[in-house]
């Protein structure tokens, strides 16, 4: 399975990436498992509150990610 990860705001600064591809042997992976993998790769992300969206839909940690899904890591946004 191959998925696309997109990082925004301070998360892009930490990873020094806007986007990357991840490949897994599994057919699916939970958002929770992906979050753990990302936080072990980019440890400073653990210090930031962020939301995860799967295919442009806000997601909880139990959602299953499938091949070709696009996962966005979104820091808090302010605006008005």
For each predicted feature, which ranges?
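Ubiquitin-like/PB1-type beta-grasp interaction modules and other compact soluble beta-rich domains
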Residues: 1-78
């Amino acid at each position: 399975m191959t998925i696309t990860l997109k990082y925004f705001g301070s998360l892009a600064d930490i990873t020094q990436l806007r986007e990357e591809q991840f490949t897994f042997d599994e057919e699916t992976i939970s958002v929770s498992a992906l979050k753990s993998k990302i936080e072990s790769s980019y440890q400073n992300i653990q210090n930031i509150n962020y939301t995860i969206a799967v295919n442009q839909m806000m997601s909880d940690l139990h959602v299953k990610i499938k091949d070709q899904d696009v996962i966005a890591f979104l820091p808090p946004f302010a605006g008005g």
